Amino acid sequence: VKEKSVRVCVGIFCLFLLTPAMPLRRVASAPSPETYKQDAQGLEKQFEPFLKAFQKGDDKGMDESFGVFRLPKPKEWFGNYFSVEDAAKLSSVYDREITDAESSLIEDMNRADPGSRFRVRCEPRGESGAGQDSSGGYGLRPVKPIAVEQFRLEFRSGSHDQKFSFIANFVYVDGAYRFVGGGGAAFWAKPEAGR
């Protein structure tokens, strides 16, 4: 009996040595969000799901796909760049800013060519002082510089060649451009931001 148990132990030991190591099982995690290049083509690609949803008249799809332009953690992001008081103000109005931007874009597309397939062309205007207070002291001033990238966005319909364009400001955070205001400056640098 003792000899049999020794053989079994030796057999198990040999089996252990000859068996290749089993790969460790990976824990399933949430898929990572898509990342986009930090250039005009990356921004154009970022708009594609939204433009497809618009063509289909898919309101839910438009809302979901426009979400990529939102700061992932606005309170934390504003807290990194502004005083505590200003960060609280900005994070409380940011949702309205992004919702208004989406609504305005949809209105412009409907005016230009409702239900059409649009393409966007993004022309960089460079990194500028668009994120700094350029309003004569009425806006909110960041405590450290913010790399705001400004683009001229031209939307052109595929069916009737209708087009419109505007200037928009973005920050590049976590692999995507995040909208921070239209026109010549980020929303916090405009006079109404401090009110």
Describe the residue ranges of each PLM region.
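Short acidic DE-rich linear segments
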Residues: A193-R195
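Short, low-complexity N-terminal intrinsically disordered segments enriched in polar/charged residues
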Residues: L24-D59, L71, K75-E76
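Conserved catalytic-core segments centered on acid/base and nucleophilic motifs
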Residues: F47-G57, M62-S65, V171-Y172, Y177-F179
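N-terminal secretory signal peptides that target proteins for export/translocation
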Residues: V1-V6
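Short, well-ordered alpha-helical segments enriched in acidic and aromatic residues
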Residues: D59-E85
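Surface-exposed, charged secondary-structure patches
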Residues: F78-K163
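Bacterial N-terminal signal peptides
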Residues: C9-P20
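Short beta-strand edge/turn micro-motifs at domain boundaries
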Residues: R141, R152-E154, H160-P191
